From Swiss-Prot:
Cross-referenced PANTHER family: L-2-HYDROXYCARBOXYLATE DEHYDROGENASE (NAD(P)(+)) (PTHR43128), L-LACTATE DEHYDROGENASE (PTHR43128:SF31)
Enzyme class: oxidoreductase
GO molecular function: L-lactate dehydrogenase activity
Name of this protein: L-lactate dehydrogenase
Function: Catalyzes the conversion of lactate to pyruvate.
Catalytic residues (positions): H176
Residues reported in the UniProt entry to bind substrate: R89, N121, P122, V123, D124, D149, S150, A151, R152, T231
Matching CDD domains: HicDH_like (cd05291)
Coiled coil recorded as keyword: no
A Gene Ontology cellular-component term: cytoplasm
C-alpha cells in the first residue's frame, strides 16, 4: 500500500492559508488537516481549498480538525501568530510562545511522531522552543528561517544582473530578522563566483553597493507589510518547498532555521543556514566560507539568538 503524505497546519491566517494553497497547487500532499483558534475559520478554509480539487495535479483531501487529527500527520506546519505594522519580530515572542505551548505538548502526547516545520515569528526562537516543548530530535524540528530572505536576495540579484534567479545561488544567514547577513562571498551565478561576475560586468553594478542590496532584503518584509498588512505568497511557497523536500527525500540544500551543534563555531540554538533537507528533516548543515564582514555579522546574529532564548526562558513555558 502506498503511503499517504499527510500535512497539518496550525494557524490558518494569511500565512497558513497560503501555505495550504501552495502545497495543494504543487501536489505536495495527499491529505491536509487545518486547525485554528477560530474553528469556523479552519472549516471555511478547508471547504474553500476543497473547491480547488478539480484544478490540482492530483486528488487531495482537506478538512478541519483538532489535536487527534493532527497527531496522525507526517508534518505539522506551525503558522500561529500575527505581525502588525512597525512591529519587530522579536516583540512577538511572548505571544508566540504562549501559542505553541497551547498545542505542541498535547499533539505530541496524542502520538504525533513526524516533523515540525515552524513559520511563527520570531522563527528561530520559536523553533527552539518547539523542540524544547516536543522533546523531538533536533533534525525533526525545522524553521523556515532565512529561506524566504534568500529568495528575496536572489530576486534582487536577478533584477540587477538580468539573469534568471533560478541559476543564482545566494544565501541570507543568521536571524530571520534585522541582523541577518548576505553571504555574497560564496554566492554564484551558474557556478561563476558572484564577486568575480561583478568585476567582469562593472556596467551592471555602476552605483550598486552590496550593503544597500543587503538592507533591501531586510526591508522587503516591512515594505510589503506597510502596503498590504501582511506577507503571504512568498512564505507560502517557501514552506511548500521545504515540505516537498521532506516528503520526496530530495536531499536538496535549502536555507532554513536549523539547530547548530558545532557548525559555524556555535551550538545550542537555531539560526538560518543552508542545510540538506530529506525525509529525516535536516540531514546535514553545510558550512559556507564567510569573509570577515560576514563572520562578524553572523556572530552578531547569533548573539541576538542567544539573548532572546534567555528572554524566552524567563517566560517559563517549558
Amino acid at each position: 500500500m502506498l503511503q499517504t503524505r499527510k500535512v497539518g497546519i496550525v494557524g490558518i491566517g494569511h500565512v497558513g492559508s497560503h501555505c495550504a494553497l501552495s502545497m495543494l497547487l504543487q501536489g505536495v500532499c495527499d491529505e491536509m488537516v487545518l486547525m485554528d483558534i477560530i474553528p469556523e475559520k479552519a472549516k471555511a478554509h478547508a471547504i474553500d481549498c476543497m473547491d480547488t480539487i478539480s484544478f490540482l495535479p492530483h486528488r487531495a483531501i482537506i478538512r478541519d480538525g483538532g489535536i487527534q487529527e493532527l497527531s496522525k500527520m507526517d508534518v505539522i506546519v506551525i503558522s500561529v501568530g500575527s505581525l502588525t505594522k512597525n512591529e519587530q519580530r522579536l516583540e512577538e515572542l511572548k505571544g508566540s510562545l504562549e501559542a505553541i505551548k497551547s498545542f505542541v505538548p498535547d499533539v505530541v502526547k496524542a502520538g504525533f511522531n513526524g516533523i515540525f516545520v515552524t513559520i511563527t515569528n520570531p522563527v528561530d526562537i520559536v523553533t527552539y522552543f518547539v523542540r524544547e516543548l516536543s522533546g523531538f530530535p533536533k533534525n525533526r524540528v525545522i524553521g523556515t528561517g532565512t529561506g524566504l530572505d534568500s529568495a528575496r536576495l536572489k530576486r534582487i540579484l536577478s533584477e540587477v544582473t538580468n539573469i534568471d534567479s533560478q541559476v543564482i545561488q545566494a544565501y541570507m544567514l543568521g536571524e530571520h530578522g534585522d541582523t541577518q547577513i548576505a553571504n555574497f562571498s560564496s554566492a554564484t551565478i551558474q557556478g561563476v563566483p558572484f564577486l568575480d561576475y561583478m568585476k567582469t560586468h562593472p556596467e551592471q553594478f555602476k552605483g550598486v553597493e552590496l550593503s544597500v542590496l543587503e538592507k533591501q532584503v531586510v526591508r522587503t518584509a516591512w515594505d510589503i507589510i506597510s502596503g498590504k498588512n501582511c506577507t503571504e505568497f512568498g512564505i507560502g511557497c517557501t514552506c511548500s518547498n521545504l515540505v516537498k523536500a521532506i516528503f520526496h527525500n530530495e536531499r536538496r540544500v535549502l536555507p532554513c532555521s536549523a539547530y547548530l551543534n558545532g557548525e559555524y563555531g556555535h551550538s545550542g540554538f537555531y539560526t538560518g543556514v543552508p542545510a540538506i533537507i530529506g525525509s529525516n528533516g535536516v540531514e546535514e548543515i553545510l558550512e559556507l566560507p564567510l569573509d570577515e564582514r560576514e563572520r562578524k555579522g553572523f556572530e552578531d546574529a547569533c548573539a541576538v539568538m542567544k539573548k532572546y532564548i534567555e528572554v524566552g526562558k524567563s517566560y517559563k513555558i517549558v
